[in-house]
Amino acid sequence: MPELPEVETVVRTLRGLVMGKTIERVSVHLARIVRQPDDVEAFKSLLVGQTIQDIQRRAKFIQFFLNEDVLVSHLRMEGRYGVYQADDPVEKHTHVVFHFTDGTELRYRDVRQFGTMDLFPKGKETTIGPLAKLGVEPLDKSFTPEVLGKLLKGRSTKIKPLLLNQECIVGLGNIYVDESLFKAGIHPEKPAGKLTDKEVIRLHESIVSTLQEAVEQGGSSIKSYVNGQGEMGMFQQSLLVYGRKDEACTKCGAEIIRFVVGGRGTHICPDCQKNQ
């Protein structure tokens, strides 16, 4: 699933490709992608004539700000956007197409068919939709070691599942939680409330630096992820533990292991991340 760096990269590329374009019509080939409104014809009708004024990321969601509404899109496992000319061949698994007045198209393709789209009147998207209960943005200036410490204080939950909880901190998924915990030297099963002040500071620093580096490198293309221009990310080449089971730790040389925490495959260095 695309995480914060991948979604941020998609947003940045799409801004340069479709901002300012006006929707002439919309084609929906898989109705269940559209959740709000529950009438697909209403969804299509509401979008006609609206111009994309801005595109922003909130957590792992893409927000298309239009004249009257906000389209909130989640890529889920393998959703992707691409911009094409109207006469370009349409790839299999293309489920939604936004046809622009200039003859170009924004196409949404999703092999797994798990992605979602919700259309809300401006101002309502943060109160009644999937954005309503999201936690703090880890790349926002408001995310400080003190804020992280308050989120963890008194929690008996293991640190990894808590970091994956989007109501606490948004945008983190399996890849970047494993990487952040490794850099901070913290075992993923340690109770969140048991982290020392120094560990909280290290964890904060590792979360921010890991995400910033990943954004700079266009995200991680582990499976099918590409940005809005069809380009792969490069951060997978910089991963220190994720996906490196049985390889040597870059810090100490110990063998990286994989096990399950909270139902999620987890990679650690058993020497650098002792459970104590």
UniProtKB/Swiss-Prot annotation:
CDD domains: EcFpg-like_N. A zinc finger (FPG-type) spans 240-274. Keywords: DNA damage, DNA repair, DNA-binding, Glycosidase, Hydrolase, Lyase, Metal-binding, Multifunctional enzyme, Zinc, Zinc-finger. The keyword Aminoacyl-tRNA synthetase does not apply. The active site is at P2, E3, K60, R264. Binds 1 zinc ion per subunit. Its EC number is 3.2.2.23, 4.2.99.18. It holds the Pfam family Fapy_DNA_glyco. Disulfide bonds: none annotated. One of its GO terms (biological process) is base-excision repair. The keyword Lyase applies. PROSITE patterns: FPG_CAT (PS51068), ZF_FPG_1 (PS01242), ZF_FPG_2 (PS51066). Signal peptide: none annotated. DNA binds at H93, R112, R155. It catalyses: Hydrolysis of DNA containing ring-opened 7-methylguanine residues, releasing 2,6-diamino-4-hydroxy-5-(N-methyl)formamidopyrimidine; 2'-deoxyribonucleotide-(2'-deoxyribose 5'-phosphate)-2'-deoxyribonucleotide-DNA = a 3'-end 2'-deoxyribonucleotide-(2,3-dehydro-2,3-deoxyribose 5'-phosphate)-DNA + a 5'-end 5'-phospho-2'-deoxyribonucleoside-DNA + H(+). GO terms for molecular function: 8-oxo-7,8-dihydroguanine DNA N-glycosylase activity; class I DNA-(apurinic or apyrimidinic site) endonuclease activity; damaged DNA binding; zinc ion binding. Its cofactor is Zn(2+). Involved in base excision repair of DNA damaged by oxidation or by mutagenic agents. Acts as a DNA glycosylase that recognizes and removes damaged bases. Has a preference for oxidized purines, such as 7,8-dihydro-8-oxoguanine (8-oxoG). Has AP (apurinic/apyrimidinic) lyase activity and introduces nicks in the DNA strand. Cleaves the DNA backbone by beta-delta elimination to generate a single-strand break at the site of the removed base with both 3'- and 5'-phosphates. Monomer. Belongs to the FPG family. This is Formamidopyrimidine-DNA glycosylase. It comes from Brevibacillus brevis (strain 47 / JCM 6285 / NBRC 100599).
